[in-house]
């Protein structure tokens, strides 16, 4: 794969690349600016207009990403990447900063700030997502029946600081296992403690297994330079975030993934589950479970034009119990 770093192609198809004659050192700067026009209409759900005056909100123009960075390889086994998202603020300005040492195809170590091993939607190569926004079911915070302003988890874990081992076995089985801070993309400092309940480091423990029967699945949701692929991916991922949300909860996540590339056609579907259980100090015995998922597809109707659609489903309330009692 020429995008095995999960960031941008090193094969020289886009932009330019600096490398030594022997090819043992490759350096590639890149720039990605994403602009979008947004229109969102929200159902008032029968509420009085005095309390919910506008059905149209969060609409207009936006620049969610203005990424400047560089990536590359050294000594034939070390990959690296550093990128800044000028459209973000605070700690999220530093989007990625990591190095990856591949001892062999079956075993590599990655250290720094990078994507946690959860969800095909997040793990897609920079700039090659089907739609400009991630599924809302991954990014929207859940609603809990307590006035705890610091407890607003969402299912997606996104970027984080940590260490991960990963590899590819028999050119069809992939694995990723890592330890992360569990504080997300906006925090670049070490702020974790030991769990008072479980007596283990209060970190994010995450893993992902993939099966790709037709060879390595490119981490793309549509690339006009790759219209002759025939690949398929099945994935299972899970994580436990110990004492997350300001040491208030222990969050468990499980996800199922499917993705397919067949010439001009791309299809994907994911389903994910999150259980939010409170730490003993909160004195809340009840836990809350949430389900979400989406299906999406894209088709290149012209060499550089891809039509896309997504159906996203998510109930921000404790919808496992809603399903059981309905």
Language-model features, listed with the residues they occupy:
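Short coil-to-helix leader/linker segments, especially the first N-terminal amphipathic alpha-helix
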Residues: 1-17
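Outer-membrane beta-barrel pore domains
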Residues: 2, 22, 55, 98-102, ...
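Short, structured loop/turn "capping" segments at alpha-beta junctions
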Residues: 7, 217-220, 267
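Short sequence motifs at beta-strands and strand-loop junctions characteristic
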Residues: 8-10, 58-62, 89-91, 154-157, ...
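Outer membrane beta-barrel
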Residues: 15-185, 201-216, 226-227, 296-317
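Outer-membrane beta-barrel translocator domains and adjoining extracellular loop/strand segments
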Residues: 41-49, 87-98, 123-127, 186-195, ...
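Active-site rim elements
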Residues: 83, 150-152, 192-196, 241
């Amino acid at each position: 794969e020429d995008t095995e770093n999960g960031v941008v192609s090193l094969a020289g198809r886009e932009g330019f690349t600096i490398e030594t004659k022997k090819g043992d050192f490759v350096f590639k700067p890149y720039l990605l600016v994403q602009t979008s026009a947004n229109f969102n209409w929200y159902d008032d759900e029968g509420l009085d207009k005095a309390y919910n005056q506008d059905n149209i909100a969060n609409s207009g123009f936006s620049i969610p990403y203005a990424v400047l960075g560089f990536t590359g390889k050294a000594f034939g086994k070390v990959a690296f990447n550093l990128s800044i998202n000028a459209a973000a603020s605070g700690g999220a300005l530093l989007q990625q900063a990591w190095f990856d040492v591949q001892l062999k195809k079956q075993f590599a170590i990655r250290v720094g700030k990078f994507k946690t091993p959860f969800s095909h939607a997040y793990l897609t190569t920079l700039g090659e997502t089907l739609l400009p926004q991630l599924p809302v079911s991954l990014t929207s915070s859940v609603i809990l029946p307590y006035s705890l302003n610091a407890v607003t988890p969402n299912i997606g874990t996104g970027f984080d600081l940590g260490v991960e081992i990963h590899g590819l076995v028999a050119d069809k089985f992939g694995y990723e296992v890592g330890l992360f801070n569990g504080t997300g993309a906006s925090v670049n400092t070490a702020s974790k403690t030991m769990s008072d309940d479980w007596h283990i480091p209060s970190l994010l423990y995450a893993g992902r297994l993939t099966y790709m029967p037709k060879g390595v699945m490119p981490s793309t949701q549509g690339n006009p330079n790759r219209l002759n692929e025939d690949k398929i991916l099945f994935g299972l991922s899970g994580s436990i975030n110990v004492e997350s949300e300001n040491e208030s909860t222990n969050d468990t996540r499980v996800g199922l993934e499917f993705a397919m590339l067949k010439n001009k056609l791309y299809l994907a579907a994911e389903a994910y589950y999150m259980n939010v259980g409170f730490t003993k100090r909160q004195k809340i015995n009840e836990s809350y479970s949430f389900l979400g998922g989406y299906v999406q597809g894209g088709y290149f109707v012209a060499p550089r034009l891809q039509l896309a659609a997504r159906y996203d489903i998510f109930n921000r309330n404790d919808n496992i119990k809603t399903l059981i009692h309905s």
